[in-house]
Amino acid sequence: MDTRLLNAFVVLADTGHFGEASKQLCISQPALTKQIKTLESQLDIVLFERGRHGAKLTQEGQYLLNQAQVVLRESHILEKQARQLVEPQKVSLYAGFGLSSLSFITSLLARFNQIEPNISVNIDDMSSHKMEEKLLIGELDVAFSRLPVMPPLQGIALTQEQLMLAIATQHITVLEADYNPLHYFDSLGLILLAPEKGKKLYQQIHAFLQQHKLAPRLLQQSQDIQTQLALVAAGLGIALVPKSAQLICDKQRVTLLPLSGLYTQWKIGVIWNSNIKNKERDL
């Protein structure tokens, strides 16, 4: 069976939308539709219910999804091990990272390069949810992301992240050490990060809003934190972002106010798949 078809199946199941899935796969929507129909024909099973709101897994599709993920995982591991046998002198590690690890990952990689100059490290920026997916199927050897994680993934905490309220400096009315910034939710709309771009952060933000009984006016969804901050800087609303966003925000126009209470802090660490052995990673 063509693993490309299985990969298309898994990505579409994850996104639930042909447009988003085709972007991730770098193919056209008609090509993706053809791949899914080909797989359904081969299996003689309807995997998705198509509708105006996207693609939803059928009961049969849901049942087969886990098996498809297992096959892809083993396929990636086999390909990687085969490459290492053919070219054992070329050793590479593949690492995922996000904004929350940006403050320390460069110095960490520089130190690793001094210790192991013959091992190249390829890094890729992605969401924590995507990192976990790629670790599970063997596409990443290690990731620097949020904790905790579920087995077989394991992690060690390296630093702590905090939820902040990003607000245009022009909108700030009071800046006192003991002042609660939650009142800004009453007057300013919220600019959210699209859930598919940061699923865990999106879930945490909603948990925070529910915990504090906040129901802000939702203005729009952004595809990345940089765009969120740009919209905030323009005075179009407020946003909930990790503290590490201070590395990329316009500090003259945007102020980050710390939030306290439940769902405002989480740990960032190094994560790996304990089911996949890798001597270079485990050095």
Name what the model sees in each region:
Residues 66, 107-111, 124, 128-168, ...:
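Short beta-strand-centered segments that line the small-molecule binding cleft or hinge
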Residues 151-157, 161-162, 226-275:
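Beta-alpha-beta core module
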Residues 188-212, 278-280:
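Secondary-structure junction motif
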Residues 86, 157-191:
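Flexible hinge/capping segments at coil-to-helix
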Residues 42-43, 64-86:
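Alpha-helical linker/hinge and terminal dimerization helices associated
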Residues 29-30, 87-116, 120-125, 129-133, ...:
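N-terminal winged-helix
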Residues 40-57:
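A short LG(V/I)-centered, amphipathic sequence patch enriched
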Residues 10-28:
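Short helix-boundary/capping micro-motifs
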